[in-house]
Amino acid sequence: QEKLIAWMKSFLTPDGVIFFGFPPWQMPFGGHQQVMTSKLLSKLPYFHLLPMPVYKSVLKLFKQDVAAFAEIKETGISIERFEKIVHNTGYKVVNKTHYFLNPIYTYKFGWKPLHQLGIISAIPHVRNYFTTCVYYLITRRNTG
């Protein structure tokens, strides 16, 4: 993740920006379990947070694609990790929006987007569990 974000700077004009939108890993369906073939697992929030050996056992028991969902688990990202990568790779945040209800849910479920409460967005680590989507606009950090 850090290597990719750092590499993207080579395509960025001096006044350019990069948009990122992602679900924090710890959100209820951060493991993309909604696409699982098991009706139970596809509706079970947070179970992707189980320790990897337990998670793989559950996937195997329910005849899911263990390798695919384990890879998703291994590449999940939190808000804090993303912000640390942004800082460490020489970018700065221009704008950020945290959502309690992801804008894509308009198309999936007919739900209107709902911004996350400021108090929740301000609490590191806790916000990951209750924020379904974040949007970030980043640019080069001035070094001089």
Annotate the PLM regions.
Residues 43-64:
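A structural motif
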